[in-house]
From Swiss-Prot:
Lacks the C-terminal regulatory region which is replaced by HisZ. Its EC number is 2.4.2.17. NCBIfam families: hisG (TIGR00070). It comes from the Bacteria. Catalyzes the condensation of ATP and 5-phosphoribose 1-diphosphate to form N'-(5'-phosphoribosyl)-ATP (PR-ATP). Has a crucial role in the pathway because the rate of histidine biosynthesis seems to be controlled primarily by regulation of HisG enzymatic activity. The lineage of its organism: Bacteria, Pseudomonadati, Pseudomonadota, Gammaproteobacteria, Oceanospirillales. InterPro entries: ATP_PRibTrfase_cat, ATP_PRibTrfase_CS, ATP_PRibTrfase_HisG, ATP_PRibTrfase_HisG_short. This is ATP phosphoribosyltransferase. It catalyses: 1-(5-phospho-beta-D-ribosyl)-ATP + diphosphate = 5-phospho-alpha-D-ribose 1-diphosphate + ATP. Heteromultimer composed of HisG and HisZ subunits.
Amino acid sequence: MSKQLILALSKGRILQETLPLLADAGIEPAEDFGKSRKLLFDTNLPDVKLVVIRAVDVPTYVQMGAADVGVAGKDTLLEHGAEGLYEPLDLEISRCKLMTAGIVGAEPTHARRRVATKFVNVARRYYAQQGIQAEVIKLYGAMELAPLMNLADEIVDIVDTGNTLRANGMEPRELIDEVSSRLVVNKASMTMKHDRLKPLIERLGQAVASRRETQA
């Protein structure tokens, strides 16, 4: 196994909140992501590289060993499954909630509750645990439209401020899970590169703790 460490980072908001933590842990990209079309980036450390990919792909890259370490939202990990992954650290960034939601005051109109979501596995598990028969419909965006068009009775989606729900006459209902970004590590890498990964995890943990104290 290569001595090089590959870190897989999620694009977007998670990336912007991860970079300061990495900097506090001593890892900084050698160039600006926004000004490059590269996919694999050098860092200030010669044996550490970064890849910036879609959030949904991070668990796969880490699970299959293409990356040693990754940063992904808990929602993505719940949907993907955690086989082959360690989850040693809650980075406490990109916080939100994974919830059910529906039109204010509306009752289900379908014999089997119709649920629109991109979190198909999460939704199936949740409704089964509640003893509710549900037909889960996979959508990729604009979840709030599904109940308005009578495509679904409820949705399962990420809720941050709840403003989009309210703007469409909807309300959050049941909390499925609290979501934040997590550090995940390939199990084989954790064994073979333990001497490299343990200090990194510890430094990131210290950065998270310092950030928490600053915000208190």
